[in-house]
Curated annotation (Swiss-Prot):
It comes from Scheffersomyces stipitis (strain ATCC 58785 / CBS 6054 / NBRC 10063 / NRRL Y-11545). Residues 404-417 have a biased composition (Low complexity). The PI(3,5)P2 regulatory complex regulates both the synthesis and turnover of phosphatidylinositol 3,5-bisphosphate (PtdIns(3,5)P2). Necessary for proper vacuole morphology. Plays an important role in osmotically-induced vacuole fragmentation. Required for cytoplasm to vacuole transport (Cvt) vesicle formation, pexophagy and starvation-induced autophagy. Involved in correct ATG9 trafficking to the pre-autophagosomal structure. Might also be involved in premeiotic DNA replication. This is Autophagy-related protein 18. Keywords: Autophagy, Endosome, Membrane, Protein transport, Repeat, Transport, Vacuole, WD repeat. SUPFAM superfamilies: WD40 repeat-like. SMART domains: WD40. Residues 329-430 are annotated as: Disordered. WD repeats lie at residues 36-74, 247-287, 292-331. Belongs to the WD repeat PROPPIN family.
Length: 563
């Protein structure tokens, strides 16, 4: 049973109402004492607006600023391993769960602490291990393997309890809109069974334990048997389930909501397809191919302007998918093509076989495309730099990949008088010359040939076959400079253009006369922040016009005290 112990019940509401007081940012706030020397990273995450990083260690935790510039702003050292730590924006409010390896600590105990006052606001004890904690300005979400607890964050009052199917990886997502009138949604995996209009409440959601007992109709778009990749959308304001979005046939590996709650991105445990849905309608808006080979997707995140989706995976590659007009038109074209009937022809024996081939995809339309149409090239361990700079980037027209104004001015400073071919090259996706390899060049050539074949043969092939040859792929990518193997990572994107100095050699071919030049170029780039389980923070730059390979701008250690 749930047990709550308040350490400061009288002043709880007053303390939480003052959570807007920011934590110290001068680097001097820290508490020292006897502690373990092992600074192993147990947990690492960004806060809601990606302005801070929270790191759970074997000897306490650390808080870092990453905007406008990187720096440590708070540290607690103690003889307790921290398994989960979550921030509430840049405030002094933290939610902490211990690993439970030391006497007196427990992974079932959640502490709400105020770092500014160095006090514990309250403790919450749960019936099983806490797998995930999420915070918004109005709600505290605690996820166990088979329950989700919803609290009012200003009073710590339990509002609702949801019984779920086993969720051992702690998969859930929240919209984090600062505006209280915005879409306040929770997304979590649906039970692995057929969900119908009449049975959704009974099989998927138990409303006992909350202040609102929900017995209402749910708009469900799931109609396929034996699905385990559906997502339940839950309204945290009304405390009622909204809909079930049919995302994948196989089990979910990652889900995320846009900050305003309008979009949902999902990936299955196959790791080859990333999909984006409208939360309001449940309609699939985009489908992207991350790779051919199955891999583990660690995280998905939207940019704050909803123009990009960022995905990290066990391949140590980060993919950036653009939610632009050209991508939307391409997805729409494929849907239209799939629904367009083929012209009837005189029947022959050979055409009967072809007819069966055409009918089969329509009969299996409920099948997850992950099984059939997943493509890409995520063989990072076998081929270095694999899937990030395939010619599939040509799916987005070169006209849309014009250099930004700042980039154009930078190139003009040393490329004046170049011919038309070199000028056209400036509109191509950026390519990191350090990642070029023979295998990568062969891969790009083969994908170009496949794409040309798809364009010529697309009208004669069933839509599912042609979509394999002509996929919608990532707009940009980057390779993490990991030291070891099996490195986990999460990434977020800052949608504010910033002027950065980049070595000229990054943009030049190795056989170019300018490749060895030490001249720095000024480019307008979007920043992508990446943190890894090794305890490193990376800042990469993305050219929003050209895409392609992202440029490593900064690298910091979150463990090294000399940082």
């Amino acid at each position: 049973m749930l047990k709550a112990q308040s350490a400061a019940a009288g002043s709880l509401h007053q303390t939480l109402s003052q959570y807007s007081a920011s934590i110290a940012t001068d680097g001097s706030s820290s508490v020292t004492g006897s502690f373990k020397t092992d600074d192993s990273v147990n947990f690492i995450t960004f806060n809601q607006d990606a302005s801070c990083i929270a790191v759970g260690l074997n000897n306490g935790y650390k808080i870092f600023n990453c905007k406008p510039k990187f720096g440590k702003c708070y540290q607690i050292r103690k003889e307790e391993s921290v398994g989960i730590i979550e921030m509430l924006y840049c405030t002094s409010l933290l939610a902490i769960v211990a690993l439970g390896e030391e006497p007196g600590s427990s992974p079932r105990k959640l502490k709400i602490v105020n770092t500014k006052r160095q006090t514990t606001i309250c403790d919450l004890i749960f019936p099983s291990t806490i797998l995930q904690v999420k915070l918004t300005k109005s709600r505290l979400i605690v996820l166990l393997e088979e329950q989700i607890y919803i609290y009012d964050i200003t009073t710590m009052k339990l509002l609702h309890t949801i019984e779920t199917s086993p969720n051992s990886i702690g998969l859930c997502a929240l919209s984090t809109t600062p505006d209280n009138d915005g879409n306040n949604y929770l997304a979590y995996p649906s039970p692995p069974k057929t969900i119908t209009h009449d049975s959704l409440l009974a099989s998927g959601i138990n409303t006992n334990g909350g202040t609102n007992s929900v017995v209402n109709n749910i708009s469900s778009v799931s109609n396929s048997p034996n699905r385990v990749g559906d997502v339940i959308m839950f309204n945290l304001n009304t405390l009622q389930p909204m809909s079930v979005i049919e995302a994948h046939k196989s089990a979910l590996a990652a889900i995320t909501l846009s900050s305003d709650g309008s979009l949902l991105a999902t990936a299955s445990d196959k790791g080859t397809i990333v999909r984006v849905f409208s939360v309001a309608t449940g309609v699939k808006l985009f489908q992207f191919r991350r790779g051919t080979y199955s891999t583990k997707i660690y995280s998905l995140s939207f940019s704050s302007d909803n123009n990009y989706v960022v995905a990290t995976s066990s391949s140590e590659t980060v993919h950036i998918f653009r939610l632009g007009e050209s991508e939307a038109l391409e997805n729409k074209h494929k849907k239209k093509k799939a629904s367009t009937p083929k012209p009837t022809q005189p029947e022959t024996i050979e055409e009967e076989d072809a007819t069966l081939l055409q009918e089969r995809p329509s009969q299996e339309s409920t099948q997850d495309d992950d099984e059939f149409a997943d493509d890409g090239d995520d063989s990072d361990e076998a081929v270095e730099g694999d899937d990030n700079d395939d010619e599939s980037l040509e799916v987005i027209s070169n006209k849309q990949r014009k250099l930004s104004q700042g980039s154009s001015n930078s190139f003009a400073s040393f490329n004046s008088g170049t011919d038309d071919s070199s000028q056209a090259a400036k509109n191509e996706p950026l390519i990191d010359q350090n990642r070029l390899s023979v295998a990568r060049l062969i891969r790009r050539s083969s994908q170009t040939l496949g794409r040309k074949a798809a364009q010529r043969m697309g009208d004669f092939l069933p839509s599912r076959f042609s979509s394999i040859l002509e996929p919608t792929r990532h707009f940009a990518s980057l390779k993490i400079n990991a030291i070891g193997k099996d490195v986990k990572s999460i990434a977020v994107m800052n949608n504010e253009l910033q002027e950065d100095l980049v070595p000229q050699a990054f943009l030049m071919r190795k056989d170019s006369d300018s490749y060895l030049s030490k001249e720095m170029l000024s480019l307008n780039l979007l920043h992508i922040y990446v943190v890894t389980s090794e305890g490193f923070f990376y800042t990469y730059g993305l050219d929003p016009e050209r895409g392609g390979d992202c440029i490593l701008l900064h690298q910091y250690s979150l463990i090294d005290e000399s940082n």
